[in-house]
Every structure is written in C-alpha cells, then in structure tokens.
Amino acid sequence: RLKDAARRLEICRNALKNRDFETFAEIIEIDSNMMHAIMMTSNPSIMYWQPTSIKIMQTVRALRQKGTAAAFTLDAGSNVHVICEGNTVNKIEALLREISGVKEVIKSSVGSGAKFVESA
C-alpha cells in the first residue's frame, strides 16, 4: 500500500484536475479498502466494517453505475464518508437515510479556503 501511495496520489490529483470523477472514485475507494484489508489481515485482526458500512458502500457503487457521481471512503472505523457533487446531495442523503442501521447523516461541503490568522 505504501509503496504505491505516490502513484495513486498522482492519479487522484490528475483526476481532480481533469474533473474525472470516475477515476477519482476508483482510487479513493481502492485506497480505503486497502487500508482496511491491512487491518483485517493483521494479527490481531481489526474488523471495523459493519453490515451497515458494507450496505452503504454497495449503495454508493450502485449509484455510480447508474450515472450518479458518488464515491466512498472510510476512516479507521466503521464511518463511511460519501463524496458527491453538490447537485446530488439531497438524493444521496435520502437514500442513505433509508438504509437500516444508518444512525446519522452529516452533510458537509467545501469550505472557503485557508486563511492566515494573526496570533494575539
């Protein structure tokens, strides 16, 4: 995973620059899955994925196969983060809320950017 990280990062950067959501989605999902595969195959094993996590991942992939730009990544836990375009947020939120086991859907968006703050 680490030996290939720079290559995947470059692919991700190019995908963002070229607005190639499909490639971006594939790379971030692969990277997330690889991180979790390492945890699952370590000794002792750590298994964060829950049935609801897997259902969300399947739902996101199905959406993308039908043409909706959506991708998932997971933190070092069972929390699935869905990345999508702004015009699909409400549709995806509604679908996620229908999944049994989903406790909360938190919407976020791109911020205004970094700002320099003078210390007091």
Predicted segments with their positions:
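C-terminal nucleotide
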Residues: 1-120
